[in-house]
Amino acid sequence: FVNLPELMRIYKETADIQTSDMLDLPVPEAKIIAVESELTQAQKYYLEELVKRSDAIKSGSVDPSRDNMLKITGEARKLAIDMRLIDPAYNLSDNQKILQVVDNVERIYREGAGDKATQMIFSDIGTPKSKGEGFDVYNELKDLLVDRGIPKEEIAFVHDANTDEKKNLLSRKVNSGEVRILMASTEKGGTGLNVQSRMKAVHHLDVPWRPSDVGRILRTFKIKKNVEVTDNGKIII
């Protein structure tokens, strides 16, 4: 950035900036607990290939139109979540994170049954597809959670609420506990969606590009109890 101090000085002439710390806003307490996912053999092998490709790109021996660091970064993000995002021929056993997320979501679901506590799962990768269009993370998570005994009616995708009326209805269902697990991307669920009334946990499967997108339910006035948030397979309590 150039002339940033000057820009901020001009901005402050017309803006009144108040942070949550300055206002002493009530927010729930949070403690971060890292839950690591071990690489499977399939992930290790593919990661080694990405390193080799990266070295080739740095040496200039590869045409950027055929392979480049942006492509490698995208594949690495997919690898970290589920290998089937790279190639549907891989199996569930070639991944650990998905099952860890399912374990955490089910645990919190059972623990919060009395209060109808709700949860959100954020993933910007592997968003829902129509049947027959290939593998996606959202439907895989839903199927695995249903296999654990969670009613499918209590699981929803924010992507299905494609009108204001449907979004308002979805918000009411989540706030009432009728829907207890909501999956969303950062774009569709990060702001402007008021579903915090019973929210107990938020799980981030991938790392958002902006740090401010992590821990959304900590920035609401409506939460009065401690919460759990997961970031990239890590649980934050």
At which residue positions do the language-model features occur?
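Inter-lobe coupling linker of SF2 helicases/translocases
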Residues: F1-N91, R107, I237
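Conserved helicase motor "Helicase C" RecA-like lobe of SF1/SF2 P-loop NTPases
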Residues: G126-F157
